[in-house]
């Protein structure tokens, strides 16, 4: 399985060094864990509060910025065999929210960013924690397992 990654850093912070190789590894580990075998592509945009707030309001009706927004690809299934890689969609990650949450949750910014990558990628694959308690438990369990493979602690465990 090959992953094509498009990374746009519209917002950068000295408190979070983003390394393309680490980002790619987190996404590839997620895809491998849920047994995605096809070549895939994903877009990631790192944004500020203002962009996140605007997108969250426009697409989810929520009047605030948020840590990660997931926009799954809407390419029709019948077109996919014609493509070199399956477009999974795009993630929009609000770096200031990730940094604030990391402090609140007593985590490193890097660990929380990786969690948001895994979480968002699972959303792109159709997992949803807002539909039912069972779905939330399944998604959290997957996140814990994937993050462990990346050498990161359970993000839901109290620090």
Curated annotation (Swiss-Prot):
It comes from Acinetobacter baylyi (strain ATCC 33305 / BD413 / ADP1). InterPro entries: MetalPrtase_cat_dom_sf_prd, YbeY, YbeY_CS. Keywords: Cytoplasm, Endonuclease, Hydrolase, Metal-binding, Nuclease, Ribosome biogenesis, rRNA processing, Zinc. Single strand-specific metallo-endoribonuclease involved in late-stage 70S ribosome quality control and in maturation of the 3' terminus of the 16S rRNA. Its cofactor is Zn(2+). Its EC number is 3.1.-.-. Zn(2+) binds at residues 119, 123, 129. One of its GO terms (molecular function) is zinc ion binding. One of its GO terms (biological process) is rRNA processing. It is found in: Cytoplasm. It comes from the Bacteria. The lineage of its organism: Bacteria, Pseudomonadati, Pseudomonadota, Gammaproteobacteria, Moraxellales. Gene3D superfamilies: Metalloproteases ('zincins'), catalytic domain. Belongs to the endoribonuclease YbeY family. PANTHER family: ENDORIBONUCLEASE YBEY, CHLOROPLASTIC. GO terms for cellular component: cytoplasm. This is Endoribonuclease YbeY. PROSITE patterns: UPF0054.
């Amino acid at each position: 399985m090959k992953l094509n990654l498009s990374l746009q850093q519209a917002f950068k912070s000295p408190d979070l060094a983003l390394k393309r190789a680490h980002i790619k590894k987190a996404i590839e580990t997620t895809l491998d864990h849920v047994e995605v075998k096809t070549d895939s592509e994903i877009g990631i945009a790192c944004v500020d509060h203002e962009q996140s707030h605007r997108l969250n309001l426009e697409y989810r009706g929520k009047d605030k910025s948020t840590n990660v927004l997931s926009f799954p690809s809407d390419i029709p299934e019948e077109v996919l065999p014609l493509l070199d890689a399956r477009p999974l969609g795009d993630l929009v990650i609000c770096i200031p929210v990730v940094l604030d949450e990391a402090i609140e949750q007593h985590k490193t910014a890097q660990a929380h960013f990786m969690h948001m990558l895994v979480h968002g990628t699972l959303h792109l694959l159709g997992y949803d924690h807002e539909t039912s308690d069972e779905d939330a438990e399944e998604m959290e369990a997957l996140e814990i397992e994937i993050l462990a493979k990346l050498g990161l602690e359970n993000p839901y465990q109290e620090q």
